[in-house]
């Protein structure tokens, strides 16, 4: 926020942070020019470059191994309190995962869904998370709830910035955002299958939490500093039970600055404005 107030947007890398054993990287998306560079475009053409690539998805590629499988913790080894997390604002209830992307797969079609959900540690093996946007993940959770089942999921913490942008794209339930990521990369996203539920996650991710969301379980979370610039305790209070943690040996904490920071807003804004520009172009060709 201090950088933003001074009109600066540098990516921040902190090698030593009190309470963390890994490097902290944040403010990645604060610069539109930096995101445009990732797409090989000028800043003025950012929305066009994103849309051109996102509308040419490439099917993910499953690989047998990857750095994210270098360390696997399960059973009594799982302790979410050991995750490198930071508290973003004074009134946040606890340290939060702000960059966590929950990946689920439709039990009927196998199509994957990626979405962001703020999450805080509730116990050694449970995250309290909010699905208050009520998107595709909410639909899938209700689908399995009607069957009396749980929803297998994998939360990715720390991925390539283009993968993170793909997770923020607004697409139909029949479109797999992992394929959108492939379109943004210009080559298929390489994924490994998680050990138990077989969910495709980036082979190079820093951390992956594999487990289930129990449709019936609840745990309070919030307040948390939201994009509106206000602290909000609006939440569905869902519970993600983590059964195993996968991580790289050289993992880092890739954090998204909370609140109404440029980092946070651009992550959501760039895919959204690209979609809107395309729809305006279809309706008004001269725009």
What are these regions, as identified by a protein language model?
Residues 1-224, 229-239, 244-287:
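Extended, highly charged
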């Amino acid at each position: 926020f201090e950088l933003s107030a001074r009109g600066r947007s540098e990516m921040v890398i902190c090698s030593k942070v009190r309470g963390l054993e890994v490097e902290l990287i944040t403010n990645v998306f604060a610069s539109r020019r930096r995101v445009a560079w990732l797409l090989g475009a000028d800043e003025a053409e950012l929305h066009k470059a994103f849309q051109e690539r996102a509308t040419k998805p490439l099917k993910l590629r499953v690989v047998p191994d990857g750095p994210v499988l270098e360390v696997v913790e399960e059973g009594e080894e799982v302790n979410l309190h050991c995750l490198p997390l930071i508290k973003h604002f004074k009134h946040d209830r606890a340290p939060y995962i702000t960059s966590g992307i929950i990946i689920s797969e439709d039990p009927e079609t196998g199509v994957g869904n990626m979405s962001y959900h703020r999450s805080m540690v509730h116990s050694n093996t449970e995250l309290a998370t909010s699905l208050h946007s009520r998107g595709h993940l909410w639909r899938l959770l209700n689908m399995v709830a009607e069957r009396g089942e749980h929803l297998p999921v994998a939360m990715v913490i720390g991925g390539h910035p283009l993968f993170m942008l793909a997770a923020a794209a607004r697409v139909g339930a029949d479109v797999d955002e992992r394929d959108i990521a492939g379109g943004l990369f210009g080559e298929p996203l390489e994924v490994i299958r998680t050990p138990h539920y077989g969910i495709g996650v980036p082979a190079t991710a820093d951390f992956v939490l594999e487990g289930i969301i129990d449709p019936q379980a609840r745990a309070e979370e919030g307040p948390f500093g939201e994009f509106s610039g206000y602290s909000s305790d609006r939440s569905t209070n869902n519970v993600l039970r983590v059964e195993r943690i996968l991580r790289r040996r050289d993992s880092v904490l890739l954090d998204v600055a909370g609140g109404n920071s440029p980092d946070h807003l651009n992550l959501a804004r760039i895919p959204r404005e690209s979609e809107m520009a395309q729809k305006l172009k279809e309706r008004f060709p001269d725009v």
